Amino acid sequence: MNIGRLVWNEDDKAIVASLLGKRALDYLLSNSVSNANLLMTLGSDENLQNKLSDLVERPNASNFSWNYAIFWQISRSKAGDLVLCWGDGYCREPKEGEKSEIVRILSMGREEETHQTMRKRVLQKLHDLFGGSEEENCALGLDRVTDTEMFLLSSMYFSFPRGEGGPGKCFASAKPVWLSDVVNSGSDYCVRSFLAKSAGIQTVVLVPTDLGVVELGSTSCLPESEDSILSIRSLFTSSLPPVRAVALPVTVAEKIDDNRTKIFGKDLHNSGFLQHHQHHQQQQQQPPQQQQHRQFREKLTVRKMDDRAPKRLDAYPNNGNRFMFSNPGTNNNTLLSPTWVQPENYTRPINVKEVPSTDEFKFLPLQQSSQRLLPPAQMQIDFSAASSRASENNSDGEGGGEWADAVGADESGNNRPRKRGRRPANGRAEALNHVEAERQRREKLNQRFYALRSVVPNISKMDKASLLGDAVSYINELHAKLKVMEAERERLGYSSNPPISLDSDINVQTSGEDVTVRINCPLESHPASRIFHAFEESKVEVINSNLEVSQDTVLHTFVVKSEELTKEKLISALSREQTNSVQSRTSSGR
């Protein structure tokens, strides 16, 4: 029974389909292989993260760099099928001028807060579908998910069997694929094509390698380049030649307790992947080449997961605005990616015979016998532009040939089993380095942008550059208003003109219920003196005037008489007088 159909209702499916596309939704609910069914990865590259970050962060000779880089790792499912699963990924946001016009139009027509809520909800549903816990959910630690980040975060949950999807078809044909103008083309190169178009990805390149498929994307429309394909292929080409698989059937001579430990719900004793040892005396009787071939088995032991979780020996720092994701088991030079476990009463060695097989691949040798096997690294999300790596602890102790001796007890005291899922690395207790400081600086900067967005009215766009431009315009507008108010204040209370005598004759007369107040003052001290001066210059005789006050408006009505007066002349005289008044105020304010 499909897990997705039990967890998701119709509303959830509609939201996921609106962001990922209908094909991606159907594929995730029916065809995608979960990590619980991937028991091994066929080889790995310890410098994988550095290679991906270089493709994104370091421009080439033409000053070009990709917007995202994904490595799809070759893995083998429980059924024995080859599957491409998430190996690692890295992305950056498009620079100024890299976004296409179509993406700008789409981003302007949507509500940012509503869209962010939908994205986080979809990532939460994907996380729940693949069995992650709440503390390992990277969507909870993000305040905002951009288009490119949404594409990369969603891609983590996809896996492609041979011939399925863009990476699966590239892996099956062993030929590179170069797709240009993805946004405007009607073809769907992959089940994630709708998501790629929504992120504005114009160019998608798929290059097969020895250990998987490299997927690169750019928001620019690029013509196909053979030199670029060759450089990418040479960068990811493994130094180990491809070899055929060797099956390892197990012969157990002793009875083991029925209470057998299981991994991902499957009995290790029935799955054919039991831990094996060679007896010391049998190794001495073998030829030297055979002994070297079996050295890696001496150190391959198992321990019970319920007793204690393996200690992390490798960690990667948090980064600021760049995303880097690692899949469990892809950062070590091992073939077996999941955490192996040991039955509680299992103490006797198991004899293993090695017979040839017709499988296409074989288990590649591990590191030298002097190195310990490292536990698989957890999926993590890094938030910075740096691609620094923490050093691995590969020190060896005397007599320690087992993984349990190498990793020791969990120092944090957390004894529960390690769960699958994508957990952000920002919860580690480690010394603050420059990468962590950069991440915190970016978080503070984002908070300042949110505060600025809340006080700036009439925001044209939601991006940071437009917000800064709108803020500058708003500040200039406020500065201009401030100058006008200062000039008005100088005119009213701090004018440099000499004070005019306000000797007024006030006469009050009472007639019944009516009270008549007459104020007689000099013309120069009256506010309407300039209007009377304009009438005099125009040789206009004022017959009567009336003053009325209505709320905040003063209406002064004049009845005038003139033989040569016209409407245009009177308006011109009053306007000229008003202009002279403003100029005198300005000069006095200086």
Curated annotation (Swiss-Prot):
One Gene Ontology term, aspect cellular component:
cytoplasm
What residue range is the signal peptide?
A: none
**Which UniProt keywords are listed?**
DNA-binding, Nucleus, Transcription, Transcription regulation
Query: Where does this polypeptide localize?
Result: Nucleus
Q: Which GO terms describe its biological process?
A: negative regulation of gene expression; regulation of DNA-templated transcription
Indicate where this protein is primarily found.
nucleus
Specify residue ranges for compositional bias: Low complexity.
281-293
* A GO MF label: DNA-binding transcription factor activity
Give the Basic residues compositional bias ranges: 416-425
Looking at the record, the residues that make up the bHLH domain are: 429-478
Q: What induces it?
A: By UV treatment.
Which residue stretches belong to region Disordered?
A: 274-296, 385-439
What is annotated about its quaternary structure and interactions? Answer: Homodimer.
From the Swiss-Prot or TrEMBL record, give the protein name: Transcription factor bHLH13
Source taxonomy: Eukaryota, Viridiplantae, Streptophyta, Embryophyta, Tracheophyta
